[in-house]
UniProtKB/Swiss-Prot annotation:
Keyword Transcription regulation: yes
The species this protein was found in: Bacillus subtilis (strain 168)
Keyword presence, Nucleotidyltransferase: no
DNA-binding region location: 32-55
Domain HTH arsR-type: 1-92
S-S bridge residues: none
Record protein name field: Uncharacterized HTH-type transcriptional regulator YdfF
Length: 226
């Protein structure tokens, strides 16, 4: 029996559910109230949609006392959403605020648990050009020089390879139309950059801000001038 694509398509066709899923693309957990606010819907409506998404296994929930926190189910769910963004019609910008939000997202953002946008794509390009990575089909492979480079950054390549997920997948960036680095390596890079405060998460959005020290580090370590 073929998978029921129509059921998933029906779920994603609802604007409120789509908005909730896009909010969860930052890779973090969110309480229902916050997701309702971000989707501009009532809490009761958000609960209805969250239950539908849970039934479809697109999201998961964690219970802490009386509170429930939601996240995307896994990287496969995130990949489906990211691919749909490539073919979805672009929303018309209606205000200066929306224009700035769009610009911020295009520049640097999280794509579930890795870095995307202009900065993410430039990082991938630079690592390939420097010979740290090479593209093989739709994956990135770490070279011997790359293994030493990532080790110096504090990323254990073997540890990342042993995770139960793709190691370094080419993820097509919906705004740049080029690949950035997904998978365990992409996540390890994002985590390391957050730890070193090269980048910081912006509140209530997937947008990422590059710090002043981060701009220096990107140029020094990654040969990416921001």
């Amino acid at each position: 029996m073929n998978p029921n694509i129509a059921k998933i398509s029906s779920l994603l066709s609802d604007p409120s559910r789509s908005s909730i899923l896009l909010s969860l693309m930052d890779g973090r957990i969110h309480p229902a109230g916050e997701l309702a606010y971000l989707a501009n819907i009532k809490p009761q409506t958000a609960s209805f949609h969250l239950n539908k998404l849970l039934e479809a296994k697109l999201i998961s929930v964690e219970k802490h006392g009386r509170h429930r926190y939601y996240r995307l189910a896994d990287s496969d769910a995130a990949n489906v959403i990211e691919q749909l963004l490539h073919i979805a019609p672009k929303a018309k910008v209606k205000s200066l605020k929306e224009s700035k939000e769009k610009k911020d997202l295009h520049f640097a953002r999280t794509c579930y648990d890795h870095l995307a946008g202009y900065v993410g794509v430039q990082m991938a390009h630079s690592l390939v050009e420097q010979g740290m990575l090479k593209k093989v089909d739709l994956n990135f492979e770490v070279t011997s020089e790359g293994a030493l480079f990532f080790s110096k950054l504090g990323i254990n390549e073997e540890q990342q390879r042993n995770k139960r997920r793709a190691f370094a997948r080419c993820c097509l960036d919906w705004s740049e139309r080029q690949h950035h680095i997904a998978g365990a390596l992409g996540n390890a890079l994002l985590v390391r950059m957050l730890e070193e405060e090269w980048i910081v998460r912006m509140p209530k959005t997937r947008a990422i801000r590059i710090t002043q020290s981060g701009k220096i580090a990107f140029e020094k370590h990654l040969n990416v001038k921001i």
